[in-house]
Amino acid sequence: MSVTRKDVDYIAELARLSFTDEEASRMTDELNSILHYVEKLGELDTEGVLPLSNIHDQKNVLRDDVERPSISNAEALQNAPDRQDRFFKVPKVIG
């Protein structure tokens, strides 16, 4: 399998990217290099090799959840630049 310039142009259009001719040419070469590497990996003999989802034997290295007292609402809000009732007030980010 190989990537053509037409493929790169199509993917760029889908991703709303614009490439110069030089960038598109370089991207084509780089994607073909990546695909060649993946094909090489596919040729490896992995018979008898167990699949891994994680290279570490550790299961859960996080601390246990322990309920403990927290600061009061007033303490949490005392340095807030803007608040409304018992809540932090922040700028609207979604229209």
From Swiss-Prot:
Highest taxon in the source lineage:
Bacteria
Tell me, which GO biological process terms does this entry list?
A: glutaminyl-tRNAGln biosynthesis via transamidation; regulation of translational fidelity; translation
Determine if Ligase is one of this entry's keywords. Answer: yes
Which InterPro entries does the annotation name? Asp/Glu-ADT_sf_sub_c, GatC
State the UniProt keywords alphabetically: ATP-binding, Ligase, Nucleotide-binding, Protein biosynthesis
Give the catalysed reaction(s), semicolon-separated: L-glutamyl-tRNA(Gln) + L-glutamine + ATP + H2O = L-glutaminyl-tRNA(Gln) + L-glutamate + ADP + phosphate + H(+); L-aspartyl-tRNA(Asn) + L-glutamine + ATP + H2O = L-asparaginyl-tRNA(Asn) + L-glutamate + ADP + phosphate + 2 H(+)
Using the record, list the residue span of the signal peptide; answer none if the entry has no such feature.
none
Q: What is its EC number?
A: 6.3.5.-
Pfam families on file? GatC
State one molecular function term (GO).
ATP binding
The record's annotation in NCBIfam families points to: gatC
Matching HAMAP family, A to Z?
GatC (MF_00122)
Q: How does it assemble?
A: Heterotrimer of A, B and C subunits.
Instruction: Please give the family membership noted in the entry.
Output: Belongs to the GatC family.
The role this protein plays is: Allows the formation of correctly charged Asn-tRNA(Asn) or Gln-tRNA(Gln) through the transamidation of misacylated Asp-tRNA(Asn) or Glu-tRNA(Gln) in organisms which lack either or both of asparaginyl-tRNA or glutaminyl-tRNA synthetases. The reaction takes place in the presence of glutamine and ATP through an activated phospho-Asp-tRNA(Asn) or phospho-Glu-tRNA(Gln).
The protein here is known as: Aspartyl/glutamyl-tRNA(Asn/Gln) amidotransferase subunit C
Record gene name:
gatC
